[in-house]
């Protein structure tokens, strides 16, 4: 069996070789070797990348639409070693104990969601207490596990939809890209974000320095992750390399990923492929890649015109060997479809899964969420519930006021029906009396009354207006023979009447 370290050296040589058409990858499962490929990209290139994330195609848990979700990630920190003192001073000023505790809790929840054990962070014995804290860049990397991108949304979604790399360099382009996640990366100091698509997903690289890679690097990285389309020539500007605009809004959503792949994080160290590295992610039992001895010759004196001949000469020497399984692979069965847990560990996982689904449901009903963490979600939910309570109280008060008005009108109608003689008199009076009401504005009205001049109709009109709490702005009375015409401009107070309602009330009180 060929040593795995030789395979890793072979991948590094592939990334650092001279510009030329790359070799076709061997038939190797991407899932089993994805951590090694990410390590090879970070260690095999000269650019100071801070992290590498591979977004793989999947489906949304709720809508069922095709999205890009977290597949795997490796964090190195880039050139943070050079600015450790500056970062330490910044954390001392900006980080509070509550923020540190909140970030620690989120890290523990992410780790329990993944594997149920302590997060694999390499401790630095020579560093002080501040060096073991989570920096803003590390926090941005960890929170990326909860992101997903729809078709054509976000930098990764655009790269996967167009099958062309997306590169933004400089703070102006990052903040002007229209992507919320890119803007958050600019807040933590990112100056370059690169997304390279392949058939299996999208590789995202980021750095705190401005980097302008060439198309040869794109081709080699795409080859490493199972791509087949190559780019010709190095771009002169961002517009030549990326034909589409980045001004469109980023519609990426934050969703919980119940089963993300582990995050490989080293505290202030670059990841490498040496056998002594304690945080090197070993691929599970599966295929092991070996190119053989002739691969070294393929990197010398290669001609693009004889590329097909090189494939025929090199590929037969590539060997895919299967490691011997040492026994049945242990692992927990999925909890779906099982009512009772197997043990207390499985019960705890099922409980956390139910709790996460409840948080997803709560997130769906709360209209405005300030942050993506659970604490902020609960605070926003409490504020929203209090707002609904206040609205319900206002509706109850309005309902009570309407009931009071209805009861008063009901009493007036009962009094009219209780005395037949009064009703007859009112009918007779209504025949001789004509009342017109016109609502001028929201609270102003004009009243016109035509009646006989007997029994002091002017006094009765003023008494009716006083009973109805109407303020008289102007009034006039004119008499022609036995006919009296009264006009009054009134203003409504606390009670607002409709036109027919005010006419009926005046008719009942005057007659």
UniProtKB/Swiss-Prot annotation:
Keyword Acyltransferase: no
Domain bHLH: 339-388
Chief subcellular location: nucleus
Superkingdom classification of source: Eukaryota
UniProt-listed GO biological process terms: hyperosmotic salinity response; regulation of DNA-templated transcription; response to salt stress
Any Gene Ontology CC annotation: nucleus
Keywords: DNA-binding, Nucleus, Transcription, Transcription regulation
InterPro entries cross-referenced by the UniProt entry: AIB/MYC-like (IPR045084), bHLH_dom (IPR011598), HLH_DNA-bd_sf (IPR036638), MYC/MYB_N (IPR025610)
GO MF entry, a single one: DNA binding
Compartments it resides in: Nucleus
Coiled-coil regions listed in the entry: none
Induction annotation: By UV treatment.
Stored Pfam families: bHLH-MYC_N, HLH
UniProt cross-references to PANTHER family, sorted A to Z: MYC, TRANSCRIPTION FACTOR BHLH28
Subunit structure: Homodimer.
Protein name per its UniProtKB record: Transcription factor bHLH28
Species of the source: Arabidopsis thaliana (Mouse-ear cress)
Organismal lineage: Eukaryota, Viridiplantae, Streptophyta, Embryophyta, Tracheophyta
Chain's gene name: BHLH28
């Amino acid at each position: 069996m060929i040593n795995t370290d030789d395979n890793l050296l072979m991948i590094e040589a592939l990334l650092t070789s001279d510009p030329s058409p790359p070799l076709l990858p061997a038939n190797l499962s991407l899932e089993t070797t994805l951590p090694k490929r990410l390590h090879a990209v970070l260690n095999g290139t000269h650019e100071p990348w801070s992290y590498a994330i591979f977004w793989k195609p999947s489906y949304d848990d709720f809508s069922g639409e095709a999205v890009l979700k977290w597949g795997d990630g490796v964090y190195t920190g880039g050139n943070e070693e050079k600015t450790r003192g500056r970062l330490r001073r910044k954390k001392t000023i900006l980080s509070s104990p509550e923020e540190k505790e909140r970030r620690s809790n989120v890290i523990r929840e992410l780790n329990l969601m993944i594997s149920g054990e302590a997060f694999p962070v390499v401790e630095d014995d020579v560093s002080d207490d501040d060096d073991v804290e989570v920096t803003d860049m590390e926090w941005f990397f960890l929170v990326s596990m909860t992101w997903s991108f729809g078709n054509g949304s976000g930098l990764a979604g655009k790269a996967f939809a167009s099958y062309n790399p997306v590169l933004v360099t400089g703070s102006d382009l990052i903040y002007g890209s229209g992507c919320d996640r890119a803007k958050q990366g600019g807040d933590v100091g990112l100056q370059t974000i690169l997304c390279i698509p392949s058939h299996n997903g999208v590789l995202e690289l980021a750095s705190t320095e401005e980097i302008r890679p060439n198309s040869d690097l794109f081709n080699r990285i795409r080859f490493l992750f199972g791509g087949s389309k190559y780019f010709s020539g190095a771009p002169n500007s961002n517009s030549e390399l990326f034909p589409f605009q980045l001004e469109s809004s980023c519609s990426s959503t934050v969703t919980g990923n119940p089963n993300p792949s582990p995050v490989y994080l080293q505290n202030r160290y670059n990841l490498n492929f040496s056998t002594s590295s304690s945080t090197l992610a070993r691929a599970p039992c599966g295929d092991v890649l070996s190119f053989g001895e002739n691969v070294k010759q393929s990197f010398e004196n290669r001609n693009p015109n004889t590329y097909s001949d090189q494939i025929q000469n090199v590929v037969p020497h590539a060997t895919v060997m299967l490691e011997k399984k040492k026994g049945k692979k242990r692992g927990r069965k999925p909890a779906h479809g099982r009512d009772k847990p197997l043990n207390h560990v499985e019960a705890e996982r099922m409980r956390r899964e139910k709790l996460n689904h409840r948080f997803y449901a709560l997130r769906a009903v709360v209209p405005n969420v300030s942050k993506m963490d659970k604490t902020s979600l609960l605070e926003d939910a409490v504020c929203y519930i209090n707002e609904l309570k206040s609205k319900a109280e206002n509706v109850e008060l309005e309902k009570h006021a309407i009931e009071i008005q209805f009861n008063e009108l009901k009493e007036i109608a009962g009094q009219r029906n209780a005395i037949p003689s009064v009703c007859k008199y009112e009918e007779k009076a209504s025949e001789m009396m004509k009342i017109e009401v016109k609502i001028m504005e929201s609270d102003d009205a004009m009243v016109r009354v035509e009646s006989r001049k007997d029994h002091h109709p002017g006094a009765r009109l003023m008494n009716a207006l006083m009973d109805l709490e109407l303020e008289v702005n102007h009034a006039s009375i004119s008499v022609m023979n036995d006919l009296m015409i009264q006009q009054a401009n009134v203003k409504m107070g606390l009670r607002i009447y409709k036109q027919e309602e005010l006419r009926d009330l005046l008719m009942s009180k005057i007659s």
